[in-house]
Amino acid sequence: MINQLKGKDMNEVVVVAAKRSAVGSFLGSLKSVGAREMGTVVLKDALKASGLEPSDVDSVILGNVLSAGLGQNIARQIQLDAGIPNDRNAFSVNMVCGSFMKAIQLAHDAIMLGRDEVVVCGGVENMSAAPYLSFDMRDGKRMGNANMIDSMIHDGLWDAFNDYHMGITADNVAQACHISREEQDAFALQSQLKARAAINAGKFQEEITPIEIANKKGVVVFKEDEYPRETTLESLAKLKPAFKKDGSVTAGNSSGINDGASIIILCNAQKAQKLGLKTMAAIKGFGLGACSPDIMGICPSIAIRNNLKNVKMNLNDINLFELNEAFAAQSIAVLKELELNPNIVNVNGGAIAIGHPIGASGARILVTLLHEMKRSAYSVGCASLCVGGGQGLSVVVEQK
């Protein structure tokens, strides 16, 4: 691709590597692997895949939501552990589920403005390791019981405006958009079936960085998404509502609580050509959207429309979509609102099957999109996701 870039294309920002860990289940294989270690392993592999040296990197921007207990600036920790010189900068971004999408937008902007030429962006999240918090201890708990707060739910999955779980927002969307339980379960089943088919066909192997995990029996190599489950419509139908007594959102038609890391390396196109780097795609542009927090799941439809307007495209120009499946209800709502062909959306399954490590999920869907575009020769792709609090983000990428 890079050898064909001429004129204005040389000012574009291109992707030169896209890697991720396999996604771990809650308290699963990655529970003892810290976000720092996960991110470092994947970053090193991404650098190797790109052909870049650590010294070529100008800055590092990583999304992370559950930062309590991780120490100062997880992005800086991963940068130095990966061998990137200490005279380069790094910072972390928290925009809840949109953390990576904001990170890659900032990385893109830094290159377009000429501040940097090579920027590492990505997301890291170990939801299994999120600590419990006590707000009673700072001032001294003289007597009585102390309340412990689950930081994973409090900081990652709880609507701060309505004081309820993200799952309630999905039930709100289902009710507002007239999406039945049967539709949601059918969508969830398809996600599981597509993900299992992709795994069996080895489609994720190239994008996944194996992680070695030491245990009592020795060293285990974790290299396959472990969250996908065998299920049927009948078994999904037996699940009770998870959030509202009369709701339709269940554990089976929602995304999981997961662990993982993903890294994407961006480069100025002219720099990539000078270094002889292979490129996966060019970043065409971004879109943001916002809505009422209680129906946050519809925001990808707003973000995608804004994205397409920004890049002067229409929906028919997009060959492939990766939409983060926070919940089946909101995913279906977005599909209906945009009138998308389901055959070009999440062709290898989505977060309901693969998992949703919140700060890393935007990167995971873009990594998967880029590799599917490469494999299937799709020219234009779009990745988007909703964000707790009533926001959405989107990115369009193009192969040339």
Where are these regions (language model features)?
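Active-site pocket-lining segment
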Residues: 168-171, 204-207, 284-353
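Condensing-enzyme catalytic core mediating Claisen C-C bond formation in acyl metabolism
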Residues: 2-35, 233-298, 302, 367-368, ...
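Short, well-ordered amphipathic alpha-helical segments that serve as non-catalytic structural scaffolds
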Residues: 36-51, 74-78, 103-106, 166-173, ...
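Flexible glycine-/small-residue-enriched beta->alpha junction loops
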Residues: 118-172
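Conserved beta-ketoacyl condensing-enzyme motif
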Residues: 31-98, 102-118, 123-142, 208-222, ...
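Conserved catalytic cysteine-centered active-site region
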Residues: 64-119, 161-165, 230-256, 337-364, ...
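Active-site-proximal alpha-helical scaffold in enzymes
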Residues: 95-125, 168, 174-203, 263-270, ...
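N-terminal extracellular/periplasmic Venus flytrap/periplasmic-binding protein-like
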Residues: 20-21, 32-41, 49, 183-274, ...
